Design a protein with these regions (language model features):
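Conserved "boundary/linchpin" sites in short secondary-structure elements
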Residues: 7-14, 33-48, 57-71, 76-96
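Short, small/polar residue-rich loop motifs at catalytic or cofactor-binding pockets
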Residues: 23-29
Length: 96
């Protein structure tokens, strides 16, 4: 399920990665609280800054744009009440 959520968020992260940044060097971690239908409750909570304020802002904006989160493909699965998601500017840029 996490992969489908990240696939929803990543295309909405608009950030130009500065030269010399390596994978794993700058990671932002957010917690998102969810309703059973995947709708976000409240704002994403930043648990860890990447150290790149513009990237952190781009990630938070992208999380908000992906609302509601996709439903699980397995109809019997439930949406978690809370998710912790890690973002990396190099990884996110490689997949856009």
């Amino acid at each position: 399920y996490a992969a489908s959520v990240i696939a929803c968020i990543r295309p909405n992260i608009f950030y130009a990665v500065p030269p010399g940044i390596e994978r794993g060097q700058h990671q932002a971690v957010y917690r998102v609280n969810l309703l059973p239908n995947g709708e976000q409750t409240g704002n994403p909570v930043q648990l860890k800054s990447s150290g790149l304020p513009a990237y952190d802002h781009a990630v938070e904006t992208a999380i908000r744009r992906c609302n509601p989160f996709p439903r699980p493909k397995d109809q019997s699965a439930t949406v978690p009440r809370s998710m912790q998601i890690t973002f990396d500017p190099v990884e996110d840029n490689a997949n856009n």
